[in-house]
Amino acid sequence: MTVKVRFDKEVRDYAKGEKVKDSILKLTETALAQALENFHRRMIVIEGDTLRKAELAGILAGASARVLSGILEELMKKRLRDESEDKIEVLYATDALGEETFGRKRYEAFRKHFDVLAGSNVEVKAVTFKHTRDILGRTYDLLILDMSYDYSPNDLGRIIETVRGGGLIFILAHPFEKWKNMWTGFHKSLVTPPYTIDDVKKRFNRRLIRKFTEHDGIYIITEGGKARKKPKRSKSQARIKARKGVPIPEETLFPKELYEMALTEGQVEVLKAFEELVEGGMLVLTADRGRGKSVSVGIGAIGLALALKKRTRIVVTAPELENVQALFRFAKRALERLGFKPYVVEERGLIKELYARKIGLRYYPPADGYKKSADLYILDEAAGIHVPILHKYLNKERVVYSSTIHGYEGAGRGFSVKFLKRAREKREFKELHMDEPIRYAENDPIERWLFDVLLLDAEPVELTEEDFELIEKKEVYLEEPDLDDWFENDREDLRNFVGIYILAHYRNRPSDVALLADAPHHEARVLRLKNGKIVTAIQIAKEGGIPKKVIEKMAKGYKPRGNIIPDMMVKHHYLKEFAKLKGYRIVRIATHPDAMDRGLGSKALELLEKEAREKGLDWIGSGFGASEELVRFWVRNGFAVVHLSPARNPVSGEFTAIVLKPISERAKKLIKKANDEFRIRLTEWLGDTHRELEPEIARWLFETPFGEAVDYPVHLTEIQKKRLDAFTGKVLTYDTVVDAVKPIVKLYFLDGWMKPYLDERQIRLLIYRVLQAHSWEETAKLIDRTETFTMIEVRDIIRGLWYYYKRLLKA
């Protein structure tokens, strides 16, 4: 069916009265007609310095809303929108909406004209960027994105993707020539001592502006009515094609009403896969953003709950509660469609729990969900959950892992590389990938623009046999890339660099790219093969060199942005002088996924240390989620652990460790002092704060690159010594001599390199039973032996240690 996309006389007369050129109206009509005909989005960027740009957006968006209202029924008939979506939904996003703010004034200028033209069948939601969590899982017809002052790249990714096919996006921007050289609120957040705002770069904004001009489907006008980039030809009608029919299986276990909610064949496949879960099993679902993945999972969860024909508990988890709003919303819609009256529990405006007769869905953080008893476990945005936590759900009777491959929370092949490979060894499961977009048609130009500007689909370079030979021979060199060149000239190296992070790290956000682009203290390093290919990516932050006045403030609680390691050393180790020293904090280091475990990471650290030494720096350090693999990597590369966070990260389920390696003699004294202090603390923390820390991790935290024993006096009374003799001679039991055993075990862990040899199992036993005070039953499970065997083993270990340290205590 062909529809007219032409603003009526009333709109044209009003626009004329407001001095809007007819050519600008025609440009907007054309953009809307193109969007409707292709079921894509179109974007109109309005450059300007005054409220006029917001007024112009109000007129153009109001006129567009009026046209869309007139064809709503037709869009529903063509299955381009749900029957429940019977209003034109408009989103206005800005940096501030408080009284007397410029953001508020622009919003009011927009509404003044929009409300006159849009008609009554329209709903406008205004949000600040801080509250964009409120819109996740929702869909809009028109978006007005006010980027006049502040925005973060994360906001950009999240907001743009809420607009459906057939919709328009209006961007309020400064004149490009001015914007290129402006600092935004995001830039101000990057200032850290000793830097000032003048040191902040503007690479990201310049890239964004360039991408507006490069991509199709984006038109640029000025608030004065000049078209800087316009369609090749005008268009005032659109042939609206129906969404292709989706065949519903003749025989279904779930109610047909649920299948009727599916808009693509991919969604039908997901529902069929959920039917198979009735008998138990595991489903892995991947998709690019906007493919209806979370929607399908929400509908499927309700179908499964009904098919089980019993009281059903469903645990839903994801990195953040925001991630599962579409899932909850469509689960609720599915229940309503079947005649239920669901009860919703919200937290800060977000759905957290959903209940209907004998059915309950509840969100838990990833590190808590697996501990709950349930009939189905759903892990949405699973690529954002740390791999050890993903494994905790693997043995559940029914489990669904669902993940975005590309998108603002994407993880490339990382999810497959890091998790699925190991999961296949443990159990069979069904894999589904959803290709067909649901919110808009394929090849949407705005999606292409977004993926390009935010590097959401960046991939590392492909490696050949010749490359692996170079890797084997370590024919590599470390280089500081020219970030001006990378960002301004859109070098392939930038995509390869970011691509390594996307595949290797469990969580990537667009702001990471902007941080690299603009933060004055952030730099990149790459490990290249002799032929120039990037195999290891390093992002570093220059820290330290902090003025004395700021250090005094830090000691009293002030937290300077960006100086994570100096701040920790001042607050936790009272080493104010450390904040004066300069060093590199390694923010992220990752190796090409096809070249892992070949020593490239260690080689990169070796070369970075050499560079730091030549530049006269004092230290190199890093902070990371403490897994056994990572702590071992840093310790084996000569780094000393100086801090461990008291609580686990709710998403990764890991404690954060901070490690340091001294370069200067001044730094060596301070870092050794901090490392000694940390080891002393850890012997106590393991029985309290870190009682649940995995012993295989704790074991590596005690390792030291300094090789010396901690100067920590251990005192045993004569009676305690006699009782230790009695214990090792099988006269007394362990439980009666714990007070005497613990100091000896502490001595062992605080000792230097010249200490008695214990194997890995024995070390874990001492940590788990003595320092963490777990029961004999739990300890026996840890080493997969009987309790009696475990008791004998512990006695034997203590006998050897007591024999060694007895002489030292006499001395």
Swiss-Prot record:
Enzyme class: transferase
Reaction(s) catalysed by this chain's protein: cytidine(34) in elongator tRNA(Met) + acetyl-CoA + ATP + H2O = N(4)-acetylcytidine(34) in elongator tRNA(Met) + ADP + phosphate + CoA + H(+); a cytidine in RNA + acetyl-CoA + ATP + H2O = an N(4)-acetylcytidine in RNA + ADP + phosphate + CoA + H(+); a cytidine in tRNA + acetyl-CoA + ATP + H2O = an N(4)-acetylcytidine in tRNA + ADP + phosphate + CoA + H(+); a cytidine in mRNA + acetyl-CoA + ATP + H2O = an N(4)-acetylcytidine in mRNA + ADP + phosphate + CoA + H(+)
HAMAP family hit by this protein: tRNA_acetyltr_TmcA
Family, as annotated: Belongs to the TmcA family.
Assigned EC number: 2.3.1.193
Residues engaged in binding acetyl-CoA: 589-591, 629, 636
GO molecular-function term, one example from the UniProt record: tRNA binding
Main location: cytoplasm
Known function: Catalyzes the formation of N(4)-acetylcytidine (ac(4)C) at the wobble position of tRNA(Met), by using acetyl-CoA as an acetyl donor and ATP (or GTP). Catalyzes the formation of 267 N(4)-acetylcytidine (ac(4)C) sites in RNA, almost always on the middle C of a CCG motif. Modifications are found in rRNA, ncRNA, mRNA and tRNA. More acetylation is observed at 95 than at 75 or 85 degrees Celsius.
SUPFAM superfamilies referenced in this protein's UniProt entry, alphabetically: Acyl-CoA N-acyltransferases (Nat), P-loop containing nucleoside triphosphate hydrolases
Gene (UniProt): tmcA
Record's GO cellular component terms: cytoplasm
Protein name: tRNA(Met) cytidine acetyltransferase TmcA
Residues noted as binding ATP in the record, renumbered to the chain: 267, 439
Keywords: Acyltransferase, ATP-binding, Cytoplasm, Nucleotide-binding, RNA-binding, rRNA processing, rRNA-binding, Transferase, tRNA processing, tRNA-binding
A biological process term (GO) from this entry: rRNA acetylation involved in maturation of SSU-rRNA
Domain N-acetyltransferase: 473-662
Cellular compartments annotated: Cytoplasm
